[in-house]
């Protein structure tokens, strides 16, 4: 757990500065750690995320059917996606957990990470308003919204790889940014993807970290399918 003094660093990562930092602390507090925990904020954030993503998809895909919109929304708000977002934000470093959860590695537990993302959404809403929260969510989901398309199969390479490894009870992939080149407005990211099933390290290179991770995951899947 990072000290409270380092929460401004998390705020910069999230792209939002809290007026009331206590709301962020509560959003990061698991029920095992204190009576004032994040479950109510999680409840609030879940609803806000759903309406924000529904609204974005409705306007982005004016010809999509209700079924396609529902499937795309489910892909974007499901626990696996929220867990990936949490790991991108390194939320596990900031969680307040009780001794039992801490000992059992709760800071890596996917359900706890996903719940913390929803709790932070609820905290932002209470700290500001629905419009500020909506704009923040759109910034978090910008690349995912750009990539998603109507259709039955909504799974991206990272999700497919994660589910494949989970099915065999194997460790999740380890993604590491090994190089960032270029100016701030025109950067190139190189990401390594390591899994226990392969001896070799696979890399992806793209204009964003997320895209590079997706490319690396896609290459790993190709190797696994050979």
UniProtKB/Swiss-Prot annotation:
Enzyme Commission (EC) number: 3.1.26.3
Keywords for the protein's UniProt record, in alphabetical order: Cytoplasm, Endonuclease, Hydrolase, Magnesium, Metal-binding, mRNA processing, Nuclease, RNA-binding, rRNA processing, rRNA-binding, tRNA processing
Active site: 46, 118
Residues the record lists as binding Mg(2+): 42, 115, 118
Location(s), subcellular: Cytoplasm
Cofactor(s), names only, from the UniProt record: Mg(2+)
RNase III domain residues: 7-129
Subunit structure: Homodimer.
Function: Digests double-stranded RNA. Involved in the processing of primary rRNA transcript to yield the immediate precursors to the large and small rRNAs (23S and 16S). Processes some mRNAs, and tRNAs when they are encoded in the rRNA operon. Processes pre-crRNA and tracrRNA of type II CRISPR loci if present in the organism.
Protein name, as recorded: Ribonuclease 3
Native source organism of the sequence: Shewanella frigidimarina (strain NCIMB 400)
Organism phylogeny: Bacteria, Pseudomonadati, Pseudomonadota, Gammaproteobacteria, Alteromonadales
